Amino acid sequence: MALIESGGVIIKAQDYKENDKLLWIFTEKMGKITAIAKGAKKSKSKLFSLTHPLCYGDYLLFKGKGLYRLSEGKIRTSFQTSLTDLEKLTYASYLCELIDISLQDEEENFNLYKEFITCLYLINTEAISYELLIRAFELKLLKYTGYGLRFDNCVFCKNKLSVSNYISLRYFGGVCDKCPKEHGLYINKATYNALRFLNNTSLDKVYRLTLTEEVKAELFKVTSFIISSVYSRKPKSLEMLKFIKE
């Protein structure tokens, strides 16, 4: 069996048999993987503290014919404050679900991995509006999984766009005044500019943006529609996010 060491975050965990756990880990080197942690349900197990959701650590895994098997590891951070605060937990769980639905097993995506880790740290620090942070992450998720939105040129005629009031949800980008408006959404021009800013700006800089509630609602409408359309299933956490917003 091959022995592999990689950083990673537990995005989902499930009890398996009497004492074991199944883990879904977003790793730096292998992408999203499924692993079994033998005996991890026992509180005295060396794997017990390593196998909780949102645990970020360095993991040593064996790769056999089937599942990976977790051998040992070392915690970098467990993002524990996210587990005790409902709002933080909901947003962090949503991030994990996005990773789960957007990636195939063992599909390496280092750029997305870096954005994911950064976003979890920023949620934990409370330094930035969670809502803006999540919208920015959604746009980067779309970009790094092949569905990035285009804002600088019309998706149809390719003419340069300074701003637009229409997003094509089929072709993932802005539409100029001369091209047909179909299979998309009319939005405020301020929303268009906000989308472009969040798409192009690093996550730790999105705090610079101040938006009205109308623009925030339109941002959510655009990203949630596309995410629900292009991936394997609609994120269940979206409903909880709507509940928190209300």
UniProtKB/Swiss-Prot annotation:
Can you supply a Gene Ontology BP term from the record?
Answer: double-strand break repair
- Give any Gene Ontology cellular component: bacterial nucleoid
Sorted UniProt keywords: DNA damage, DNA recombination, DNA repair
Top-rank taxon, per record = Bacteria
Q: Does the keyword ATP-binding apply?
A: no
What is the role of the protein in this entry?
Involved in DNA repair and RecF pathway recombination.
Query: Per the similarity annotation, which family is this?
Result: Belongs to the RecO family.
Q: Which NCBIfam families would you find in this protein's record?
A: reco
Protein name in UniProt = DNA repair protein RecO
Q: Which organism is it from?
A: Clostridium perfringens (strain 13 / Type A)
Q: What is the lineage of its organism?
A: Bacteria, Bacillati, Bacillota, Clostridia, Eubacteriales
Query: Could you tell me the gene encoding this protein?
Result: recO
